């Protein structure tokens, strides 16, 4: 899938789930389940409840996403 097809949105981490999954509330109010991208996992970037994150969503399934950036 081409990178242009992904939808990037800002959100806040609501809770931490097992296997590096997170429940994220997007700015528009939707709640999605997201996992950490490979580069964030490789560089040991920690994500805690309440962190502001950027989530990539695919147009095919808007209930799942990938966390690609953690804001300070």
From Swiss-Prot:
UniProt keyword annotations, A-Z: Cytoplasm, Initiation factor, Protein biosynthesis, RNA-binding, rRNA-binding
Cysteines engaged in disulfide bonds, as pairs: none
Main location class: cytoplasm
Signal peptide range: none
Compartment list: Cytoplasm
GO (cellular component) term, any one: cytosol
Domain S1-like: 2-72
GO MF annotations, alphabetized: ribosome binding; rRNA binding; translation initiation factor activity
InterPro entries on file: NA-bd_OB-fold (IPR012340), RNA-binding_domain_S1_IF1 (IPR006196), S1_domain (IPR003029), TIF_IF1 (IPR004368)
Pfam families the UniProt entry points to: eIF-1a (PF01176)
Function recorded in the entry: One of the essential components for the initiation of protein synthesis. Binds in the vicinity of the A-site. Stabilizes the binding of IF-2 and IF-3 on the 30S subunit to which N-formylmethionyl-tRNA(fMet) subsequently binds. Helps modulate mRNA selection, yielding the 30S pre-initiation complex (PIC). Upon addition of the 50S ribosomal subunit, IF-1, IF-2 and IF-3 are released leaving the mature 70S translation initiation complex.
Assembly information from the UniProt record: Component of the 30S ribosomal translation pre-initiation complex which assembles on the 30S ribosome in the order IF-2 and IF-3, IF-1 and N-formylmethionyl-tRNA(fMet); mRNA recruitment can occur at any time during PIC assembly.
Family: Belongs to the IF-1 family.
The protein, known as: Translation initiation factor IF-1
